[in-house]
């Protein structure tokens, strides 16, 4: 690290379960963004892992991923492969839940490629593999995974890319985890919504993705109490897989389940979506669901005037008057009654998200009082 030029970054494919203490400590000392780790989990189904001749300690892998996550200086990409032996749709989504709960920066879904001369090509008949005859020789169906389920997983992959891997919906993803019974259901439900509303195969703008997600949530709110689980294990699945995928049972992530947490409201989602929009950039066009800010012009104007006279929260804006600061930063009134300041001169070195400070307005003191300073993406105060 003594030769780090502060610019060059490195990408490593690693087996995180064999990291030792010295290696983990070294990662913790690195400059944010110096390295990026790609960890090929592929599956958490023990029969699948055994059949493809992999040796992986999922408990140690999770511990290593958690440790690196807490450093918040290294992007971690965890990979899953659909179409492996003994993995049907529900088994794959169980693996998806296990890996999602490890909180990767990206959860990359791939599809099995049957390369010439590979072990998988040798097992074509045994696994009843159907795959494309031209590059990339991607799987179309297996003994355990019919073509219709491959198509379903393609839809899930698209939603994961847009709403999770993009990093553009950090606060909203946290709320979605509370709304749905399991992580997989978030993305299967979104994929079904896109398909049912003719939204697939279209190049949507960034703002359109937020509008679509809000309409999806509105519909869920209207139909609450009538929704069915997005993915159910059909009778006979255990016979077809030869396994009930329990690989993650002993090492489930220590988080509250959706059933034990208070369900977010549509108002909560409006706040989270506005947070997600502004934490990335000072947007010029506001979405249709955005709250009216005109009743709070006085509080916003007084905040920036106070910062011009005596900079407290926007110390990097010296030389700019209050009107200029109001254009360079942004103060948004949320539906929960608080204000959130977005400071674009200070950004998280890993995610690129702006510094965010939550305030409440004290009418007696005629000023804003800080509540907390945070990035929901990292879950910690990023100035500390």
Region roles according to the model:
Residues 8-13, 38-44, 68-73, 106-116, ...:
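Short, surface-exposed, charge-dense and proline/glycine-enriched linear segments
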Residues 47-52, 84-91, 103-188:
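Flexible glycine/acidic-rich beta-alpha junction loops that bind and position SAM and/or redox cofactors
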